[in-house]
């Protein structure tokens, strides 16, 4: 099972029937909706398609709304596009004009006040560079540094300049309120430059009474400079390498990627590495070697999730792109030596939750546990465990569907549905039973359970327990390929008075005496010391269609009256408690 999550952008390439289901089966965890394109009606239709597909494949898929953000763009050109020659003069104006080879409008009215003579302006994702020669009223006069084509609505970037754009445009606000109505799980906030930008978005979400998690997209030098204050108020980060590589030198992006991932790991906040990860697969069925290395290195850096953009939204091979990413993740995770404490430093001032989660990782590591089970309301406990990157599985048991979906962005966490309970014993039992039921753990696995008591409150994680799930108590020869769980009833303890026997009890006998046949008929199963497929115990099991374990020599010494056990006729095993005896 891959531990790195995959975010897939949906679009025309995923509209064909069955594509989304196949992408989910291939490893998709989160559906991204790019609100730079498409109407609300189109986005709502695709969101419903994702929900329907997730129901078909029985998988939880989170929805992520990616805002257009405060962008500066060119206006419309008379011919739709023009070709600029190196050395020519080209003017940008805040007036509304039709674009020509010499002039274009821009949508940011304050641009003339933000820039200075000598600044560089990049057009069309950095394909054309301009140098500012003069600022004359509403006009910015520039010289074209290199030839290239530009066209309608192409992006305008001014590296190193903090533009006076509002963090949330009118369109963004409308999109956010639409997302609240549609029940999205995450908002990817584009072009975040400072902490107050995140606060402005959160204010809109809270006005709709929605607790939607905000993933800050770092796409310019100002965002990089203020990364720490942004992370104070954001719920996670997206390393948006495409726009970031336009705003700052491309050679600096790999180092910044590692820096931002490390900061998120240390804080226990999810981080997505995005843009051009398998770009060639938009048109080709296989990635380049460089792309495969890029994906693998992001995983080794510690990213929680890796993202596909045009590869799935508009590409010819969306399913193959997801499957390729899954294979790269699985191979990288197996080869990588994940030290449990290399990804996150211990806090100088630890909270109770962080201390208990770190301790649970250490206990699991030392005991060789198969899984850490976290009983969680909001998912915070699972995130706190995941920040230490344990070698074993992390299984979050929660009563809330929205928490299950949020965990789809968290490294290594598998979320399953539970129900609200207060008693700690019931909490542990539910976690183990749920994990066994989904096949996340197997009978006999040692697991570490962490939770908060009393339950129901966020941030109260204060309990660690070590359990063996479905511990094997006895082995013998099985009759009938079925399993059953019930309470132990030891016939020898009742001195020929069996009135206390309840339907479904597990009858324990030395030999099947004739007087026991009446209650054997009502038993869930039989555990017998006697052996042999022609023994009376075997005949009783076959006659009444119930599983029998024969030759359980130490049954009377090992089992306790009333103990809950599971007997597995196929494997000839008796497990303690409820076991997923498949």
Give the role of each language-model region.
Residues 1-65, 69, 291, 306, ...:
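N-terminal intrinsically disordered, low-complexity, charge/repeat-rich segments that act as generic
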Residues 3, 8-13, 42, 161, ...:
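Conserved alpha/beta-domain cores
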Residues 25-30, 181-185, 205-210, 232-237, ...:
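Glycine-enriched alpha-helix->loop->beta-strand junction motifs that scaffold or abut catalytic
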Residues 1-12, 16-17, 24, 39-44, ...:
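Expand to "…catalyze enediolate/carbanion chemistry for C-C bond making/breaking, isomerization
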Residues 10-13, 28, 35-38, 67-70, ...:
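Short, ordered loop/turn segments at secondary-structure junctions
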Residues 88-89, 261, 265, 272, ...:
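ATP-dependent carboxylate/acyl-activation modules
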Residues 70-169, 173, 434, 440-495, ...:
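Acidic, glycine-rich flexible loop/linker segments
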Residues 41-44, 50-57, 101-129, 195, ...:
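Phosphate-interacting basic helix/loop segments used at nucleotide- and nucleic-acid interfaces
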């Amino acid at each position: 099972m891959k531990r790195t999550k995959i975010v897939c952008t949906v679009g025309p390439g995923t509209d064909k029937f069955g594509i989304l289901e196949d992408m989910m089966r291939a490893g998709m965890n989160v559906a991204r909706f790019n609100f730079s394109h498409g109407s609300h009606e189109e986005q709502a239709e695709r969101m419903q398609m994702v929900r329907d597909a997730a129901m078909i494949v029985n998988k939880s898929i989170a929805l992520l709304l990616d805002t257009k953000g405060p962008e500066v763009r060119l206006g419309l050109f008379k011919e739709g596009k023009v070709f600029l020659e190196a050395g020519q003069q080209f003017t940008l104006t805040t007036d509304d004009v039709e674009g020509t080879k010499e002039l274009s409008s821009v949508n940011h009215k304050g641009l003339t006040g933000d820039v200075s003579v000598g600044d560089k302006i990049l057009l069309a994702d950095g394909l054309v560079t301009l140098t500012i020669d003069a600022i004359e009223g509403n006009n910015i006069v520039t010289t074209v540094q290199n030839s290239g084509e530009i066209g309608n609505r192409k992006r305008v970037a001014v590296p190193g300049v903090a533009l006076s754009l509002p963090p949330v445009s009118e369109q963004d606000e409308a999109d956010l309120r639409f997302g609240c109505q549609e029940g999205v799980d995450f908002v990817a906030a584009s072009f975040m430059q400072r902490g107050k930008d995140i606060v402005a978005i959160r204010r809109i979400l809270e006005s709709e009474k929605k607790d939607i998690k905000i993933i800050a997209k770092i796409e310019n030098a100002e965002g990089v400079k203020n990364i720490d204050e942004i992370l104070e108020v954001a719920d996670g980060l997206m390393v948006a390498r495409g726009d970031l590589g336009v705003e700052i030198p491309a050679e600096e992006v790999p180092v910044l990627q590692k820096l931002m991932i490390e900061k998120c790991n240390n804080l226990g906040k999810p981080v997505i590495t995005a843009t051009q990860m398998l770009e060639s697969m938009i048109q080709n069925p296989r990635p380049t070697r460089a792309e495969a290395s890029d994906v693998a290195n992001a995983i080794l850096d510690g990213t929680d999730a890796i993202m596909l953009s045009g590869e799935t939204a508009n590409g010819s091979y969306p399913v193959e792109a997801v499957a390729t990413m899954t294979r790269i993740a699985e191979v990288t995770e197996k080869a990588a030596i994940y030290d449990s404490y290399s990804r996150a430093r211990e806090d100088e001032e630890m909270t109770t939750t962080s201390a208990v989660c770190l301790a649970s990782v250490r206990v699991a590591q030392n005991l060789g546990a198969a899984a850490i089970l976290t009983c969680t309301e909001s998912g915070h406990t699972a995130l706190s465990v995941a920040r230490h990157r344990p070698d074993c599985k992390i299984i979050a048991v929660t009563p809330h569907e929205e928490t299950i979906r949020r965990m789809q962005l968290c490294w290594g966490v598998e979320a399953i549905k539970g129900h609200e309970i207060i008693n700690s014993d019931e909490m542990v039992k539910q976690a183990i039973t749920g994990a066994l039921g989904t096949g996340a753990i197997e009978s006999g696995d040692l697991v570490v359970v962490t939770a908060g008591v009393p339950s129901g409150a966020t941030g109260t994680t204060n309990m660690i327990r070590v359990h063996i799930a479905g511990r094997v108590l006895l082995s013998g020869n099985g009759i009938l390929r079925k399993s059953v769980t019930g309470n132990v009833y030891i016939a020898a303890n009742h001195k020929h008075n069996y009135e206390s026997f309840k339907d479904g009890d597990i009858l324990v006998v030395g030999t099947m005496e004739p007087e026991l046949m009446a209650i054997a008929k009502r038993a869930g199963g039989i555990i017998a010391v006697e052996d042999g497929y022609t023994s009376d115990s075997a005949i009783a099991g076959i006659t009444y269609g119930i599983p029998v374990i024969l030759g359980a020599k130490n049954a009377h010494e090992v089992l306790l009256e009333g103990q809950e056990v599971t007997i597995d006729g196929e494997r000839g095993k008796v497990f303690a408690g409820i076991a997923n005896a498949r």
